[in-house]
Amino acid sequence: MWGVVDDSAEEPWHELWGLFRPDGDVSWQHKALCAQTDPEAFFPEKGGSTRDAKRVCAKCEVREQCLKWAIDHDERFGIWGGMSERERRRYKREHRERA
């Protein structure tokens, strides 16, 4: 049947994943500058430049929350909080050794 679409059934999925919830642990994402930028810059092909993404991150007011989220969730792809996956691994290792 064609007609009005009931989107209310999708809302539980948003809550499940913590999306679009002001009280969720990703509430900072709506302030992220990367949300206004080409996402491909943050997920470059192997060997591709990360410079543009890191430049955006450097100006972003939620960079620290973004980096913490990526580290806490073991994010393995892309630039998060101004760091590549390799840089995040090194950061985690260095901070673990200091603790």
Curated annotation (Swiss-Prot):
It is found in: Cytoplasm. Induction: Constitutively expressed during all growth phases. Repressed by osmotic stress, not responsive to a number of other stimuli. Binds 1 [4Fe-4S] cluster per subunit. Following nitrosylation of the [4Fe-4S] cluster binds 1 [4Fe-8(NO)] cluster per subunit. Keywords: 4Fe-4S, Cytoplasm, Disulfide bond, DNA-binding, Iron, Iron-sulfur, Metal-binding, Transcription, Transcription regulation. The Fe-S cluster can be nitrosylated by nitric oxide (NO). Upon Fe-S cluster removal intramolecular disulfide bonds are formed. GO terms for cellular component: cytoplasm. [4Fe-4S] cluster binds at residues 34, 57, 60, 66. It comes from the Bacteria. Its cofactor is [4Fe-4S] cluster. GO terms for molecular function: 4 iron, 4 sulfur cluster binding; dinitrosyl-iron complex binding; DNA binding; metal ion binding; protein-disulfide reductase [NAD(P)H] activity. One of its GO terms (biological process) is cell redox homeostasis. Residues 33-90 form the 4Fe-4S Wbl-type domain. InterPro entries: 4FE4S_WBL (IPR034768), Whib (IPR003482). PANTHER family: TRANSCRIPTIONAL REGULATOR WHIB, TRANSCRIPTIONAL REGULATOR WHID-RELATED. Acts as a transcriptional regulator. Probably redox-responsive. The apo- but not holo-form probably binds DNA. Belongs to the WhiB family. This is Transcriptional regulator WhiB2. It comes from Bifidobacterium longum (strain NCC 2705).
